[in-house]
């Protein structure tokens, strides 16, 4: 198993979360999942559940359970609901572009990382693959990501199992292998951190999610940033020696955890 056919691993694998990290899509993402759940549950109203960091199958399953669907029926109903959610979201691509936004610094950081040899940027997200592609495409970001080697909610409903899937795909489809210190998960929730920790890789958390920086401030991520607007700080964290870079000026804006925590 070799990287780029040269018998050595590429320098960095950056696994990007989508919602709250790269972009915010407005209400369309939630409404698409709700439309799928309503289709199979036959209800006009569904319980309003927190979604941050969860996979699409997990969210729909929780919606259906909250609507009174029997747990034994989830295996047959969740795929039907997901199919409807995909259909709905595909029709709202332009709407997401109008109502949503790309978070500060994201485009510039993607450009800078793409310009560096040996840096790969797949997605690692709770979205099913089709919906992830629709969401990044709504903002013209799809060209930055190696979508076939990403890991998605339809690969496994448990987010903690997604990093190994991405690593396996990089090896099988691109011939590239990575050591844990070469891999970063970038996300905006505690579930992104748990996902990284389960695989023994590094995690950069940003405060651009629905609940802001307070939601991640106290978490033991390898690095914390309010947002990605400081490109130099983000590059220092992601590409620095041993993967730890140098702490940015400005306190929590680019705070790096020490190896001891």
Which residue stretches match the model-derived regions?
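Non-catalytic pre-domain segments flanking phosphatase-related domains
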Residues: 1-16, 65-70, 182, 236-261
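Active-site neighborhood of HAD-like aspartate-dependent phosphohydrolases
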Residues: 2-52, 58-65
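Membrane-embedded alpha-helical bundles of multi-pass transporters/translocases
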Residues: 13, 64, 85-86, 209
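Short, acidic loop-to-helix structural element flanking the phosphoryl-transfer center
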Residues: 15, 91-123
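An amphipathic alpha-helix signature
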Residues: 30, 34, 56-57, 61, ...
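Substrate-recognition "cap/lid" segment bordering the active-site pocket of phosphatases
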Residues: 98, 122, 127-184, 190-199
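Short acidic-hydrophobic, aromatic-tinged amphipathic segments that line or gate anion-handling sites
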Residues: 151, 223-228
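Acidic, Mg2+-coordinating phosphoryl-transfer loop and its flanking beta/alpha structural elements
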Residues: 185-223
């Amino acid at each position: 198993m070799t990287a780029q056919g040269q018998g050595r691993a590429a320098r960095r694998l950056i696994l990007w979360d989508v919602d709250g990290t790269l972009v915010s899509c407005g209400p369309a993402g939630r409404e698409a999942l709700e439309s799928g759940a309503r289709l199979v549950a036959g209800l006009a109203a569904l319980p309003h559940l927190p979604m941050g960091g969860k996979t699409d199958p997990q969210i729909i399953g929780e919606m259906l359970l909250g609507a009174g669907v029997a747990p034994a029926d989830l295996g047959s109903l969740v795929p039907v609901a997901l199919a409807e959610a995909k259909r709905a979201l595909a029709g709202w691509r332009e709407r997401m572009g109008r109502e949503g936004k790309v978070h500060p610094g994201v485009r510039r950081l993607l450009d800078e990382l793409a310009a560096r040899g040996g840096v790969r940027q797949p997605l690692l997200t709770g979205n099913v693959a089709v919906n992830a592609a629709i969401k990044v495409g709504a903002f013209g970001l799809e060209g930055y990501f190696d979508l076939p080697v990403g890991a998605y909610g339809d690969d496994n409903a448990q987010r903690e199992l997604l990093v190994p899937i991405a690593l396996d795909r990089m090896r099988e489809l691109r011939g590239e292998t990575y050591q844990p210190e070469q891999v970063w998960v970038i996300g905006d929730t505690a579930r992104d951190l748990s996902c990284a920790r389960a695989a023994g890789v590094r995690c950069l958390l940003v405060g651009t999610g629905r609940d802001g920086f307070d939601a991640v401030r106290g978490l033991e991520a390898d690095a914390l940033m309010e947002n990605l607007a400081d490109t130099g700080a983000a590059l220092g964290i992601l590409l620095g020696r041993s993967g730890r870079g140098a702490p940015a000026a400005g306190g929590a804006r680019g705070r790096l955890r020490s190896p001891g925590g």
